[in-house]
């Protein structure tokens, strides 16, 4: 292919197409967008709230600055699996990309059979990469984030606090709930939950406490008495 990002401008009479990033060579070099940057094996693209572009290319997640001047690598280095920051993180054929309102990026990591989350995009150590779903086994299995299994997840889209994954070899669309909620029933002042199974809890919007990492961030309770919340595991769910 041309290994380039192209820009299309519709002026009403014509569509004007120009090169935006990539010098046409197959590779992984960062640098000035048109003269130096190499964008081999381009797959997908998303745009953040500041108009920066992010693409999957050559086992990496690459960023094209909003002004179109530079290309940099925010995560990934070579084909493998590892969570971490910047180039310490590794992917195997990152394919689909999605982005939420807080500029967290989600990646369907095909050959690792996992769904990855990229956050802290401006960190000096590189963006943070963590696995939010998938055991890595080539299999079909529903369950909590480290129990679920995929067979070749090739695309992902974000909507209303959930990810929807095209699980190609399973011929299914899978849902990953990334904003879990816990319910304290009306009139009840004590509740016990196992963090590992929180995704399976049915909830209603008028009686919820949202749990993100180790922080209870809100809730509207039917009871006016003090609430006791007991968690049975110290293993944290992903953000």
Briefly describe each language-model feature range:
Residues 1, 10, 58, 110, ...:
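Short loop/turn segments immediately following the C-termini of beta-strands
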Residues 52-55, 104-107, 162-165:
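Conserved beta-propeller blade signature
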Residues 47-50, 99-102, 158-161:
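Residue-level detector of Asp-centered blade-edge/turn motifs that repeat once per structural unit
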Residues 12-41, 68-95, 123-154:
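Gly/Pro-rich loop segments of beta-rich domains
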Residues 177-239:
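Short boundary segments that mark the start of a structured unit
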Residues 152-179:
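Blade-level signature of beta-propeller repeat domains, shared across WD40, Kelch, NHL, RCC1
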Residues 8-13, 65, 118-124, 178:
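Short loop/turn segments immediately following beta-strands, especially the blade-tip
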Residues 2-6, 61-62, 113-116, 171-174:
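Structural signal for beta-propeller blades
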């Amino acid at each position: 292919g041309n290994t380039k990002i192209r820009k299309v401008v519709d002026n009403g009479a014509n569509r004007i197409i120009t090169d935006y990033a990539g010098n046409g060579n197959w590779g992984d070099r960062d640098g000035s967008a048109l003269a130096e940057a190499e964008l081999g094996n381009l797959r997908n693209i998303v745009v953040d709230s500041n108009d920066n572009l992010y693409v999957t290319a050559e086992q990496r997640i690459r960023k094209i600055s909003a002004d179109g001047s530079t290309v940099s690598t925010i995560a990934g280095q070579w084909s493998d699996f590892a969570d971490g920051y910047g180039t310490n993180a590794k992917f195997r054929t990152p394919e689909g990309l999605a982005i939420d309102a807080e500029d967290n990026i989600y990646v369907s990591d095909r050959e690792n059979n996992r769904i990855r989350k990229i956050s802290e995009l401006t960190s000096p150590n590189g963006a943070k990469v963590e696995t939010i779903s998938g055991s890595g086994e080539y299999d079909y299995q529903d369950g909590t984030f480290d129990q679920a299994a995929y067979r070749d997840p090739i695309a992902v889209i974000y909507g209303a606090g959930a990810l929807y994954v095209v699980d190609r070899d399973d011929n299914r669309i899978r849902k990953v709930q990334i904003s879990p909620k816990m319910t304290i029933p009306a009139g009840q002042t004590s509740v016990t939950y196992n963090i590992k199974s929180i995704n399976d809890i049915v909830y209603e919007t008028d009686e919820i406490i949202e749990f993100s990492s180790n922080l209870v961030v809100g809730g509207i309770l039917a009871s006016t008495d003090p609430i006791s919340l007991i968690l049975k595991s110290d293993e944290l769910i992903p953000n």
